[in-house]
Amino acid sequence: WKDEGVMLDLKSDQVAWADGNAWAPCIEEKMVDGKYKYFFYFSGNPVAGGGKQIGVAVADSPIGPFKDLGHPIITESPVGHGQQIDVDVFTDPVSGKSYLYWGNGYMAGAELNEDMLSIKENTLTVLTPKGGSLKDYAFREAAYVFYRNGLYYFMWSVDDTGSPNYHVAYGTSKSPLGPIKVAKKPVVLIQDPAKEIYGPAHNAVLQIPGTDEWYIVYHRINKNFIDREKGPGVHREVCIDRMEFNPDGTIRKVVPFYSSVFSVSRLFPLPSASIVQT
């Protein structure tokens, strides 16, 4: 890994409308007007006060420099409550269209305009899966969308980010804007106290290009920080595990491990005599 430095500082004048806290961001590569651009979406604390709002900054390189649009692109909840956080962007491989998803206490989605800097207001859709409980699929936050074999998979996190019970559930749709059909066995990833694995959620998904090999990336609470009152504070660690599908397209429950799921050379084959420093 190489530290490329700060890509965007919300405490500086780089983002005039916000005062700190680039919360739960995501980045998307998209060709615009014949040139690849990198779009960094984030939730910031508005200078004027109130709840978080979603902004976007743009660069010609994934390491920046990024330039903020100058104003937020999502300012209010479409349902009158919840927070405008946990943004995700999905580009549909079928249509080439890009979609923005966000929300805490609700899930919203909308098609992005071709410039990737605003949404098509008439496409804004509330997608919140109905029902469920904290034991299974009651929606809290962290929507994530991917496509496989004609289905759009919607994943989300259940319970609170600081809870050992924080976990991942999912559903599917025939459209990137729903409606979502919750899976019969919706829980994909959940705590395993016997292995001292707690709060595994707020995930993303990776597909090895050209294969049907998939991985789920998420964070979980370090076992020594599970008691926030007695412990030194929240400490989360980034993890990755293999994610597999049944023949009918349903996702098999992920079994989290402490050991590595693959090596660097497994993903990116190295020429002979190459050395990887870790």
Region locations from a protein language model:
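Carbohydrate-active catalytic/glycan-binding domains of CAZyme proteins
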Residues: 1-278
